[in-house]
């Protein structure tokens, strides 16, 4: 929004043109979202307390967590508001990728909000009925797949249309899985569905300790932002042998907003947490990360960078599958972070060590850009 204002002012005073710079706008998006979170954070927390939107803690979880009962939840509203305001201010709003990400944020945030609200209203940690929850999450993921496929079909040359659908294989130069060969985009849409829903639920499962999920979200958003920048610049894309997709240039603004909003939220979510993001934050942030990975065609690199989320989700799948088949548990408790609590790690130790792992994984994911 403001980029158009400053471009117009640039006709009268040339330095205003500098604001149209992509890197400067990305930094401003970080600062704006961070400032928004810091300014309104305490107000949101006080409001959530006044509304008695306290977290319900499962009795079958770690007993040390029972002291967190009543801590305000649904703090993800603060994160999403900061992202929305910052993106609307600094992104070029004629870019369809920006609007898709904002719509994803709203859809998945709304589902998460309904889930959180039902947990609070009925004092029941289960929340929204599973089939209803996954129906709406599926609708959101399918919306992304169909929208991106439609945008790909509008491209003037067939090569770009293919690149916007085919799955890029990191490290191997010019290797791709040709989803574009499947008629009507069915292969691409189905794959997109699993990436987005998988990412959304994986982040949600990770959000179980103070500060555990939000910093890895910030780190992965930074990594994907770098990949969006590369993919959106024809020179870097050609040099690094990644698909050039012009729309990705503005995606870095959304990534910047996610970074700023996440860091601002961490201020209040660090141990001992004053507020939890809830499903409204976790589901939407995960879905946005998954969507950006699809937009940049870096789904495999995303799985590496978000390896912490992958491990948390796999731990639940293994635990449930093992118990149903063998009546035995693989871990003392799932998701994975609870297993380490059960073997004697303190909550702060689990969080700090998982953060270190997240940093390493993001670096490894970024290395795939150069190793080709």
From Swiss-Prot:
Provenance organism: Psychrobacter cryohalolentis (strain ATCC BAA-1226 / DSM 17306 / VKM B-2378 / K5)
Matches recorded under InterPro entries: Glycosyl_transferase_4, PNAcMuramoyl-5peptid_Trfase, PNAcMuramoyl-5peptid_Trfase_CS
Keyword terms, alphabetized: Cell cycle, Cell division, Cell inner membrane, Cell membrane, Cell shape, Cell wall biogenesis/degradation, Magnesium, Membrane, Metal-binding, Peptidoglycan synthesis, Transferase, Transmembrane, Transmembrane helix
Subcellular location: Cell inner membrane
One Gene Ontology cellular component annotation held by this UniProt entry: plasma membrane
Annotated metabolic or biological route of this protein: Cell wall biogenesis; peptidoglycan biosynthesis
Co-factor(s): Mg(2+)
EC number: 2.7.8.13
Gene Ontology biological-process entries: cell division; cell wall organization; peptidoglycan biosynthetic process; regulation of cell shape
General function of this protein: Catalyzes the initial step of the lipid cycle reactions in the biosynthesis of the cell wall peptidoglycan: transfers peptidoglycan precursor phospho-MurNAc-pentapeptide from UDP-MurNAc-pentapeptide onto the lipid carrier undecaprenyl phosphate, yielding undecaprenyl-pyrophosphoryl-MurNAc-pentapeptide, known as lipid I.
NCBIfam families (alphabetical): mraY (TIGR00445)
Family: Belongs to the glycosyltransferase 4 family. MraY subfamily.
Domain of life: Bacteria
Catalytic activity: UDP-N-acetyl-alpha-D-muramoyl-L-alanyl-gamma-D-glutamyl-meso-2,6-diaminopimeloyl-D-alanyl-D-alanine + di-trans,octa-cis-undecaprenyl phosphate = di-trans,octa-cis-undecaprenyl diphospho-N-acetyl-alpha-D-muramoyl-L-alanyl-D-glutamyl-meso-2,6-diaminopimeloyl-D-alanyl-D-alanine + UMP
Membrane topology designation: Multi-pass membrane protein
Residue intervals passing through the bilayer: 2-22, 71-91, 98-118, 134-154, 176-196, 211-231, 251-271, 275-295, 300-320, 349-369
Molecular function as annotated in GO: metal ion binding; phospho-N-acetylmuramoyl-pentapeptide-transferase activity; UDP-N-acetylmuramoyl-L-alanyl-D-glutamyl-meso-2,6-diaminopimelyl-D-alanyl-D-alanine:undecaprenyl-phosphate transferase activity
Keyword Metal-binding appears in the UniProt entry: yes
Protein name: Phospho-N-acetylmuramoyl-pentapeptide-transferase
